[in-house]
């Protein structure tokens, strides 16, 4: 697999999702990543630390330049815990848990987050404003309600299926209620 192509596709998708979700500085962005799927394998079976590092470093650079916080979801072997910066955990009141990821428990994305973040910790649960799922890792449990599917400009990064979610405030009220236009639902 061509690493330059994977990096280009990752950058394209992330910038597109950020444009469509209109995330603001200080927002939380969750990443689910299967490096196995990116390489054309089955999720969890052919993990690649190099691919994890390439993708996480690319995304972290884009988000950091905009003041958006990255949370990297692990696999079910770590109960889908997430790696965030300690400052983010403290700012959002997130519960820190004790686990250190490995390639096959947490995954390549989490290992990369531990490498590239300044003071990484694992947290049990977040309510992100939006997120990107590379390889059908199921990020929905970590995106706050109400979730809105976002169609990225590309449907795959490498060989991995790509989806994205944003969130919007709940619409409450009844027949008489009026709702302001939000940044995601343009009409």
Curated annotation (Swiss-Prot):
Signal peptide (UniProt feature, chain positions): none
Assigned protein family: Belongs to the UPF0340 family.
InterPro entries: Antibiotic_NAT-like (IPR028345), DUF436 (IPR006340)
Pfam family, one: DUF436
SUPFAM superfamilies: TTHA0583/YokD-like
Protein name in UniProt: UPF0340 protein SP70585_0722
Alphabetized NCBIfam families for the sequence: TIGR01440 family protein
Top-level taxonomic group: Bacteria
